[in-house]
């Protein structure tokens, strides 16, 4: 299976090792790709575990899992990687009302 993060790699060779805790994402880009894949699969455990502790109070693991399930995750575009600890990205998805959405950070 191709990895949902749009890396053109197989899931088993890309984001799956992060999702199974075999490896930890070494860069902000790898972390972002793994989180996008976790929404697409979905994997609420991984999403909660990789959410900043200060932000965990805003969502439950179940809510993250559901958000992954109710949306169709189309594409992740890496816009800029200024440093290993920063990434600018665009996540494209279709929401539960069939509206195209773009999340840009």
Regions found by a protein language model. Name each.
Residues 17-25:
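Short Cys/His-rich micro-motifs in 6-15 aa windows
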Residues 26-40:
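Short, aromatic-enriched amphipathic alpha-helices that serve as compact interaction elements
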